[in-house]
Amino acid sequence: MIWNTLVMDRSEQVRTTLGQMVTMAKQLVSAILCLALSIGFAQDDYTTKREQMVKSQLQARGIKDLATLDAMTNVPRHLFVPENMQEHAYIDGPLPIGNGQTISQPYIVAFMTEVLQLKSGDRVLEIGTGSGYQAAVLAKIVDSVYTIEIIKDLAKTAKDRLKELGYTNVTVKWGDGYHGWPAKAPFNAIMVTAGADSIPRPLLDQLKDGGRMIIPVGPYNAIRQLVLAKKKKNKITTQNLMAVRFVPFTREKKQD
């Protein structure tokens, strides 16, 4: 009798333990499903915001290049801003990304991309990586993007982010962008995302014949002109496109 009681008690304990494990497993599965649904809904929400951004901010203002529109429809801008700014990633304006720098207004990103008239086989140099967003947009269109960022923390963060998101055709370098990237030149197009007092000659020298460069030019801490420079038979022509505000072109400090 005592043996039977012990066996029954042990069996009851086993059943109880198994029941608890089943309950815990169900709770875990439920939690995972809820998390997956939450992430899915969040992604769907960002996808909708991105599509609305393209329609209301880009197409409505005259952006027509299909490659540019497609790139900005697919690049997750919210993943290129600080986490506490992600809800605002698709607003019609620039956003701070730290170190006194900003991610440009979506329309400006699209406009600068469109005027370069990029093709799939192009090699592009970007000066001023920032968050890496503009490089990601370019990477959706061309074969190779080389981008230089003078602020070390931003360069590292952008490099890691672009790698994590699968932009394998972007190469990030920490350094002074004024002198360009001679080892990777010449380039079909150059984009400068910081305001300079004048167009750096080394960048013009690194343009291919028929190449185009877009750069904000003007006095420090003032409204600048977005300038399109074209190179043909070693001659440079420039055209002012619009008035803009950009963070200043930062140079490497000279050692005394």
Spans of features found by a protein language model:
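Short, surface-exposed alpha-helical recognition segments that flank or form part
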Residues: 1, 100-103, 149
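Positively charged
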Residues: 255-256
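Class I SAM-dependent transferase core
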Residues: 41-125, 136, 141, 156, ...
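Sec-dependent signal peptide recognition
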Residues: 25-34
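Hydrophobic h-region of N-terminal signal peptides that target proteins for export
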Residues: 34-41
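N-terminal secretory signal peptides that target proteins for export/translocation
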Residues: 1-25
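Conserved nucleotide-cofactor-binding alpha/beta core module
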Residues: 117-236
